[in-house]
Every structure is written in C-alpha cells, then in structure tokens.
Amino acid sequence: MEAEAGGLEELTDEEMAALGKEELVRRLRREEAARLAALVQRGRLMQEVNRQLQGHLGEIRELKQLNRRLQAENRELRDLCCFLDSERQRGRRAARQWQLFGTQASRAVREDLGGCWQKLAELEGRQEELLRENLALKELCLALGEEWGPRGGPGGAVGSGAGPTPELALPPCGPRDLGDGSSSTGSVGSPDQLPLACSPDD
C-alpha cells in the first residue's frame, strides 16, 4: 500500500519487479495524467501571467504618454509663470512710477492751492481796506456837504450877502476814482452821493 501511494520514481527495482504489469501500467498512466494536468495548469498560469504582463505593458505605455503630456503642460505652465512674473514686475514698476507721479502732483497742487489761498487772503484784506477807505470818504463828503450846504441854510441867511471868507473856501471836489471799481462814493451819478457845493461861489 505504501508502494502504491508513492510514485514510480520512488520505487526500487525489487519493488517494481514485485509489482504486476497491470499495476505498473496503471501507475504510469496515473502519473502521466497528473503530469499532463500540471502542464495544463502551468500553461494556464503562463497565459494569465502573459495577459497581466500585456496589461501592465499597456498601462506603462499610457503612463509614458501621460508623462509626456504632463511634461509639455509643465513647460507651458513654467513659461506662463515666467511671463506672469515679468508682467508682475513690470506692473510693480509702473505702480511705483504712478505713485511717485501722484505724490509729486499732489505736492504741486498743494503748493498751488496754498499760493491761491494766500492771494485770496491778500485780496480780501485789500478789499476790506478799500471798503474802510470808501466809508471814511463817504462820511467825510457827508460832513462837508452838511457844513457847506446851500446858501440860506445854517451857514447864513438868504440874501444877506454874507458868504464864507476866502480862507475857508473849499477846493474843487471832483469824483474820486479809486481805480478798483469797488467804491460807490467816488462814481458820478451814485445814488448815495449828495450834491456838494465845492465852492462858495457855486
């Protein structure tokens, strides 16, 4: 039974001689069938390995193509990044130039505005001074008009023949022109100017 369980290669010559012819043929066929089944299984395994190998080779080819495409995209992205970086540097330089220009322009505008305000203040002061002068002249003309009113007024009787002495005679009073057009007392035909008798003989 132990000899039957083992293969023919495990039997000695004496054991093989002790076995019958039919037993030897049966064992030989059984071993051939086992070897054939092993060969078939090995062939199937080889086919599976070849199929997997072909699949891996296809994946490798696809990965190579993908790698080439990614490398091309990488080059394009690198070129784009270089271009964008140069544009960024150019934009920063332009921004600095515009900032410098804006600073200089604002400084010039502030200086011009300060000069304009100073001139405006001077003009306002001059205008106030002229107004004060005009008011003083107006008051002076009114006072002189009251003092040298028409004959028969407070200065003398009508038809008395008495007149002011030559020492008190007034000089001719012409219209005063201040030259700036802001005074209303020195203009001819002004409504607030009284008809003054500039000379006692008038």
UniProtKB/Swiss-Prot annotation:
Region feature Disordered, mapped onto this chain: 152-202
GO cellular component, one term: nucleus
GO MF annotation: an example: delta-catenin binding
Modified residues (N-acetylmethionine): M1
Subcellular location: Nucleus; Cytoplasm, Cytoskeleton, Microtubule organizing center, Centrosome; Cell junction, Adherens junction
Tissues and organs where the protein is expressed, per its UniProt entry: Expressed in white and brown adipose tissue.
Keywords: Acetylation, Cell junction, Coiled coil, Cytoplasm, Cytoskeleton, Differentiation, Growth regulation, Nucleus, Repressor, Transcription, Transcription regulation
Pfam families: CCDC85
Full protein name: Coiled-coil domain-containing protein 85B
Underlying gene: Ccdc85b
